[in-house]
Amino acid sequence: MKRTYQPSKIKRKRTHGFRARMATVGGCKVLARRRAKGRAQLAL
């Protein structure tokens, strides 16, 4: 049986990246929360 986590930089960026976050309302809210908290890194 293969492991569930098969790392891929492209997939990672496309699902969790900044532009992916900005594309949806929920994603924008995530970024807003992280800005309010003062996170150094907002998205991947």
UniProtKB/Swiss-Prot annotation:
GO terms classed as biological process: translation
Highest rank taxon of the organism: Bacteria
Keyword Ribosomal protein: yes
InterPro entries hit by this protein: Ribosomal_bL34 (IPR000271), Ribosomal_bL34_CS (IPR020939)
Keyword Ribonucleoprotein (UniProt): yes
GO MF terms held by the record: structural constituent of ribosome
Pfam family, one: Ribosomal_L34
A single GO cellular-component term on record: ribosome
Protein name: Large ribosomal subunit protein bL34
Source species of the chain: Phytoplasma australiense
Gene for this chain: rpmH
